């Protein structure tokens, strides 16, 4: 993700500030699916240190706001899912900490 943040690999940007970069997932699992990454390279949640608490708190607080801007309905009727995969057995494929932010209608659940 460092190359995406640096603009060396194209992405569809959702948000950027001095510490955080968010962009659409190239293989979405939901109508709204984007990734939020810290610009600081942290390989995974397993390497998070106490000094990263403010950054991660900002990311978690920002996720639902960005999801609303991308078309998710607000809580409680709508909502959002935030997922962090950590390590091989946790499903992590890219070794740069990232949040998957997903939401939107799920018509397959209606029955």
Task: Name each model feature, range by range.
Residues 1-111:
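HIT superfamily nucleotide-processing domains
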């Amino acid at each position: 993700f460092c190359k995406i943040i640096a603009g060396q690999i194209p992405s569809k940007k959702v948000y950027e500030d001095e510490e955080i970069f968010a962009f659409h997932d190239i293989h979405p699992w939901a109508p709204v699916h984007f990734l939020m990454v810290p610009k600081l390279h942290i390989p995974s949640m397993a390497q998070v240190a106490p000094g990263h608490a403010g950054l991660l708190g900002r990311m978690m607080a920002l996720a639902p706001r960005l999801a609303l801007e991308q078309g998710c309905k607000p809580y409680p009727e709508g909502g959002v899912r935030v997922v962090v995969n950590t390590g091989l057995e946790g499903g992590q494929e890219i070794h740069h900490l990232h949040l998957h932010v997903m939401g939107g209608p799920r018509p397959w659940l209606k029955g």
